[in-house]
Amino acid sequence: MLFHVTAEHDHLTCPGREGGMGADAVREAQKWIEGNDEVKVLGVWAHQPPHKSWAIIEASDFAAVSALLRGQMLIGKTEVMPVNDNIAARKARGWWES
């Protein structure tokens, strides 16, 4: 299954608050970006001023996603939504013309 993730925190819970973006806390907070054996991270994009990130990930179940994102969930709001691959669906139906 594919999931769309929106993760955000504020300036008070930012891992870079002490030590800046090179701090060990930032490195650890962003470790989820690497994925793991159960969750493949397909892409991650961020916009630093609002402390917000977006990702598309792939996993067989939501429990694996929750386990991967637990650290993010502890420092701010994290929204995870299952999504469909509409390009693959269109191709599977034989509707893809190019």
What is the role of each PLM region?
Residues M1-H51, F62, D85-S98:
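Short S/T/G/P-rich N-terminal loop/turn motif that feeds into the first structured element of a domain
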Residues D37, M73-G76:
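Structural motif
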Residues K52-I57:
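Short cationic amphipathic helices and targeting signals
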Residues E58-A64:
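Helix N-cap motif at beta-to-alpha junctions
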Residues V65-M73:
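Short amphipathic alpha-helices in soluble, non-transmembrane regions
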Residues I75-I87:
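Conserved short beta-strand edge segments in small beta-sheet-based binding/regulatory domains
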